[in-house]
Design a protein with these regions (language model features):
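Short, Gly/Pro- and small/polar-rich lid/capping loops
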Residues: 22-63
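Rossmann-like adenosine-cofactor binding region
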Residues: 270-360
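Glycine/serine-rich phosphate-binding loop and adjoining beta1-alpha1 elements at the start
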Residues: 97, 117-235
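Glycine-rich, N-terminal phosphate-binding loop and its surrounding beta-alpha-beta segment
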Residues: 62-134
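Glycine-rich phosphate/diphosphate-binding loop of Rossmann-like nucleotide-binding domains
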Residues: 199-311
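Adenosine-phosphate binding glycine-rich loop
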Residues: 19-27, 226-227, 331-441
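Flexible, glycine/charged-enriched surface loops at secondary-structure junctions
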Residues: 46-52, 120, 158-166, 191-194, ...
Length: 441
């Protein structure tokens, strides 16, 4: 359809969920393992290496009490999955979300291993976080929760061992609290200058310029490279984005500089449509002030189903996993899907996209800009250096385009989808290390 129906749901109706309702329980970890198995058949991975990579090296679960503002104490549950460190220190974000689970973190931790290997970074994969809604607590409570969590992890993280970063529900401020906690506890005992214990910090506290926009910038580099190879002019094209946090908002702003217009947007509160295109800078500012797109005046409320049927050219899912199943993929009216989030397309949805000829830029590549610039931050911390924005952006663009080329070359050689090609490239690097080092003892 060219535009959403004029029939709107009443304002008092429940806000549509961003979760796909077609699948009762989505086994994200099993899905990631299926991608590994498919790529492994193309790369001829030794059985013992495949067995090792199917499961994380360490699974950490911590319970810790926090005093809330009302004086009561609440027990929280935190996780850290350390999937692989065969290439270097564990690396991956910390997610605060009410639906966080061990299996999801296992899937996301494994994905970080493939992502770092694809990007030729000297990191392994990890993921973690806390099962709670960060929007439900005060700033002071959030600080205490973060500090107690990182204190509970103790020496299970460190600049040479496991380096966390922001993810869903966390940001630069979260990382500043985490770093300060580590420096005043484990760092004091080890007598080390450990500013690089986390990345994604505020620039004033050891972060790097370009990190805040890095994931969105990486998505845009991939979209621009796809457009160049496809002889597809971005100027005047239309974009829809699901999720308008760090990744979604920065992707929309950066694509606007290429002449791409955002015509539909959604988040956890609902969906909005503007056929003339949103002012992405104003929308981003509104969300920063209000926490969501809810109440934004310059857009028409639409349903979730209408959002996926909006006529556009590019779709960037930048919310959570399992958002694009078969029904959503059938409804999409775009030429390209670029995964800003991790695992937004289910295997069933991806199969429909392939059948309909809609190109897919997979998460393992498309959103790897974040961890790539996190690596640059880590290097600067270790060397006591400060890089300018030009150096960071030039390095990031080259890294993204090099990885894009590795993906397309593998896909062409093996006749496989882009996602499996990314896993294949990553596996080639990992397998070689296992063959070189062999298995202890």
């Amino acid at each position: 359809m060219n535009a959403p129906s004029s029939q709107r749901a009443p304002d008092h109706n429940p806000v549509p969920s961003t979760r796909v309702s077609t699948v009762e329980r989505y086994d994200f970890h099993r899905v990631i393992q299926s991608y590994l198995d498919e790529a492994a058949r193309l790369v001829n991975v030794p059985d013992h290496v495949r067995v090792i990579l199917r499961e994380p090296k360490n699974e950490l679960i911590v319970h810790f009490p926090v005093r809330m503002d009302n004086g009561e104490y609440r027990l929280f549950k935190g996780y850290r999955i350390q999937h692989s460190n065969i290439l270097g220190p564990y690396k991956g974000g910390m997610r605060y979300h009410e639906h966080a689970s061990l299996d999801d973190f296992k899937a996301l931790g494994a994905m970080m291993t493939w992502k770092c290997a694809l990007m030729n970074l000297p990191f392994g994969g990890a993921k973690g976080g806390i099962k709670f809604d960060p929007r439900s607590v005060s700033r002071d409570e959030l600080s205490r929760i973060t500090r107690r969590f990182f204190h509970a992890l103790g020496s299970n993280i460190g600049p040479d061992y496991d380096v966390p970063a922001p993810d869903v529900g966390t940001n630069a401020q979260t990382m500043a609290w985490a770093m300060d906690t580590y420096l005043n506890t484990v760092g004091m005992v080890k007598k080390e200058a450990a500013m690089g214990v986390v990345t994604g910090k505020p620039v004033s506290s050891g972060g790097t310029v370009g990190r805040e926009t890095a994931t969105g910038q990486g998505v845009v580099h991939c979209i621009a490279e796809w457009a160049r190879r496809a002889h597809f002019k971005l100027e005047g094209k239309k974009l829809i984005v699901q999720g308008f946090g760090n990744v979604g908002s920065n992707t929309a702003v950066l694509l606007a500089a290429h002449g791409v217009s955002l015509v539909a947007v959604g988040d956890h509160t609902g969906y909005l449509y503007n056929p003339e295109g949103f002012n992405v800078h104003r929308l981003k500012q509104y969300v920063a002030q209000n926490g969501s797109i809810a109440g934004y005046a310059n857009g028409q409320k639409i349903s979730r189903e209408e959002f996926f049927a909006v006529q556009a050219d590019i779709f960037v899912p930048a919310a959570l996993e399992n958002q694009v199943g078969a029904p959503e993929a059938e409804a999409l009216q775009v030429k390209l899907v670029a995964e800003g989030a991790n695992g937004p397309c289910s295997p069933e949805g991806e199969a429909v996209l392939a059948r309909r000829g809609i190109e897919l830029l997979p998460d393992v590549l498309a959103n790897a800009g974040g961890v790539t610039v996190s690596y640059y931050e880590w290097v600067q911390n270790r060397r006591s250096e400060t890089w300018g924005i030009e150096e960071v952006e030039e390095r990031l663009e080259k890294a993204m385009l090099d990885a894009y080329d590795r993906m397309t070359q593998f896909a062409k050689t093996h006749g496989c989808p882009n996602r499996i090609a990314c896993y294949g490239v990553a596996l080639q690097r990992l397998v070689q290390v296992y063959l070189d080092r062999e298995i202890f003892p």
